[in-house]
Regions:
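Alpha-helical scaffold domains
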Residues: 1-225
Length: 225
């Protein structure tokens, strides 16, 4: 596509957003997302419908050129990734670019709840998620660094882009992904161990862990207590 084509697509998306604008919902978001500017006020169901249309056409090209101008622009990017069809490695590569944009609970939770690749490829997506545990034995790249005995500050850790995120939303992303897709017989013990070791985040990370533990208790009360 030419750049003018992307501009046309972005104009169409922006037009759709304003057609679905709900001022009262915008006020609700503004109250519950402190510090988040440029909110249009579009409900999640409407954003999902826009994202599905994009995902069905050319999700990769859209994400390469998608703007970050408003809250809804960023939410749509996460939803498009959730609905994307294609090679898993490509989807995860784009997800690695997207996850550092998470800076509030609405972007985080809407993305996590629609990322169906986690249901289809749990083992691979688990490893992907664990990169965002940072300097933790749950992080496969961190384990490799420790096993190789690389001195601190040398060699680097191939952990994607988690260093660019606040601990709060990096860990909330992990917690909500675990809550949505991994509270099951195969992963419950790993989930509970991960929740126990997510103490570095702030309010939103702890809130995500609380959601994860609540889901764990509902499904596996004896293990969770």
């Amino acid at each position: 596509m030419e750049s003018s084509s992307f501009e046309d697509v972005n104009r169409l998306v922006r037009s759709e957003l304003y057609e679905h604008m709900d001022p009262e919902f915008g006020k609700y978001l503004a109250m519950n997302l402190p510090g988040c500017g440029n909110i249009i006020g579009v409900r999640l169901d409407d954003l999902k419908e826009i994202a599905r249309q994009i995902a069905d056409i050319n999700w990769k090209e859209y994400l390469k050129h998608a703007p970050d101008d408003t809250l809804e622009d960023v939410v749509i990017q996460g939803l498009v990734l959730g609905f994307a069809q294609g090679k898993l490695e490509e989807i995860l590569a784009y997800a690695d670019e997207f996850v550092p944009k998470i800076d509030n609970w609405w972007v985080c939770d809407s993305f996590c709840s629609t990322f169906v690749a986690a249901s289809m490829y749990p083992e691979i997506v688990w490893e992907f998620i664990m990169k965002y545990m940072g300097d933790s034995e749950l992080n496969p790249a961190w384990r490799k660094k420790e096993e190789a005995e690389i001195p601190e500050g040398q060699g680097g850790i191939a952990v994607g882009t988690w260093q660019d995120m606040s601990d709060d939303f990096r860990l909330r992303f992990v917690a909500i992904m675990l809550k949505c897709y991994f509270v099951n017989d195969k992963y419950i013990d790993k989930c509970l161990y991960a929740f126990e070791h997510m103490q570095d985040g702030g309010y939103y990370a702890k809130d995500g862990v609380a959601f994860g533990l609540a889901e764990s208790y509902f499904v596996f009360p004896d293990k969770t207590i």
